[in-house]
């Protein structure tokens, strides 16, 4: 979930800044064609900037340390396991990092398959068996091999485009009026207010679509892990999460591999654990 939150937060920040620039400067103009062109440019700018910054931002956010030279048996095992799985999945060896956190957590990120990162928490290494941790690593490797971050960026770019375009087209219609001479005029204040409100509203709807896709790709990554290490290991890893964390203890936690069972599934980046386990058993 962490990589998704970072991606969406960066994307929203860029979208907000660019949206204000559009409104203040009026750069998109009044024509539908002009608005569409600017929506495409600015819509994809937010998602692509988020994509290319994802690896650096994720690593800094957890104060993770990339393993350049293994210093102990655990780090050697991590490097060897990720290397073996990456080779089996047909992708270049990603950077591997460890960060200090009591959460049982792991994530993968990066703009391309050749510039990716797999990070695991000390909480995961301390609370999972080797077989369970191996399944989690395979899950993250599958995210990379599936190109999930790139696909998410493209989807977010399309969603951004529709958010910008629709909010400004509607705002233009609402704020426009004709004077006594029959000339069309537009109230800048009304246009700014309406476009900002609609952008936030459409942004929420867009996030529901983005979260749906995120849940879909989690099922795919689980299946990918099953193909790399066997579905029983992946099921064991998910069951371990159920044992370690009661639903109420997940509230407000920042997790990449886990989910909060109490939240509305519409806004969840990960499917409920029981659904993931059931899907694996049905493979």
From Swiss-Prot:
Compartments in which it is found: Cell inner membrane
Q: What is its main location?
A: membrane
Q: How does it sit in the membrane?
A: Multi-pass membrane protein
GO biological process, any: proteolysis
GO MF annotation list: metalloendopeptidase activity; zinc ion binding
Q: Where is the active site?
A: 140
Query: What UniProt keywords apply to this chain's record, in alphabetical order?
Result: Cell inner membrane, Cell membrane, Hydrolase, Membrane, Metal-binding, Metalloprotease, Protease, Transmembrane, Transmembrane helix, Zinc
Q: Which residues cross the membrane?
A: 4-24, 33-53, 147-167, 190-210
Please give the superkingdom of this protein's source.
Bacteria
* Cofactor(s) the record lists: Zn(2+)
- Binding residue positions for Zn(2+): 139, 143, 218
Cofactor descriptive note:
Binds 1 zinc ion per subunit.
Q: PANTHER family attached here? A: PROTEASE HTPX (PTHR43221:SF1)
Report the sequence similarity comment from the record.
Answer: Belongs to the peptidase M48B family.
Q: What is this protein called?
A: Protease HtpX
């Amino acid at each position: 979930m962490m990589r998704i939150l970072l991606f969406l937060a960066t994307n929203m920040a860029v979208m907000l800044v660019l949206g204000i620039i559009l409104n203040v400067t009026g750069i998109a103009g009044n024509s539908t064609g002009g608005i569409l062109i600017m929506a495409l440019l600015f819509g994809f700018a937010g998602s692509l900037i988020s994509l290319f910054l994802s690896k650096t931002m994720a690593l800094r956010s957890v104060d993770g340390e990339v393993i350049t030279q293994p210093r102990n048996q655990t780090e050697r095992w991590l490097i060897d396991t990720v290397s073996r799985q990456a080779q089996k999945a047909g992708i270049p060896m990603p950077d591997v990092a460890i960060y200090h956190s009591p959460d049982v957590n792991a994530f993968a990120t990066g703009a391309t398959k050749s510039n990716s990162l797999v990070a695991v928490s000390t909480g995961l290494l301390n609370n999972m068996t080797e077989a369970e941790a191996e399944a989690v690593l395979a899950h993250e490797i599958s995210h990379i091999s599936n190109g999930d971050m790139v696909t998410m960026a493209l989807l977010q770019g399309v969603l951004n485009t529709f958010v910008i375009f629709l909010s400004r087209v509607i705002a233009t219609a609402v704020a426009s009026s004709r004077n006594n001479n029959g000339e069309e005029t537009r109230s800048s204040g009304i246009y700014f207010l309406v476009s900002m409100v609609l952008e936030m509203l459409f942004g929420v709807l867009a996030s529901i679509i983005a979260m749906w896709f995120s849940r879909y790709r989690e099922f795919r990554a689980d299946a990918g892990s099953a193909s790399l290490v066997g579905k029983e290991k992946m099921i064991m890893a998910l069951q371990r999460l159920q044992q370690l964390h009661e639903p109420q203890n997940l509230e407000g936690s920042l997790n990449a591999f886990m989910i909060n069972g109490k939240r509305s599934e519409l806004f969840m980046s990960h499917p409920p654990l029981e659904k993931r386990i059931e899907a694996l058993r049905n493979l």
